[in-house]
Amino acid sequence: LELPVFEGDLVEKGDLLVGINPDIYISATSRAEASLNTSKSSLSSARARKAQADAQFIAAELAYNRSTQLFDQGAGSRADYDQAVSSFELSKAEITAEEESINAAVFQIKSAQASRNEAADNLKRTTILAPQSGIVTALTKEVGESVQGTGMMQGETIMKVSD
């Protein structure tokens, strides 16, 4: 805990009034940022796999059309035709799977962004800055004392800054 002011001190708006050790919050922010970058990389990979699946679909569709034409004319074997149908259907399924991978990666990015934002918000909460210029008129806590408060209700008064 850092408490660089004393009762009677003159402070300017934005001066540090209270600070807690930010190390774990910095680490959490770094982890969240790394997770976001990993998610973005996963999206890029999914898009690349989708492009590859699209190319394979075009090739499979051409082979299917050729094989169908040859088979219908009696010039192609049933095995070749069946293989072309199978490859064509498989390539369609691959496209669908890669589209879902892209969707999943997009949702993962949104989740990672939310985690990063939460970590950044928590890091910002490691400091309390003077809301206005003035004099510290009441300092009710000392270094080492605990302060109660939650996200749902207001915590204890640590100090007052009067103008």
Task: State each model region's role.
Residues 8-17, 67, 112, 119, ...:
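A structural signal for short beta-strand/turn segments enriched in small hydrophobics and glycine
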Residues 15, 27, 55, 79, ...:
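Extracytoplasmic/periplasmic beta-strand context in beta-sandwich domains
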Residues 37-99, 123:
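Alpha-helical hairpins and coiled-coil heptad-repeat segments
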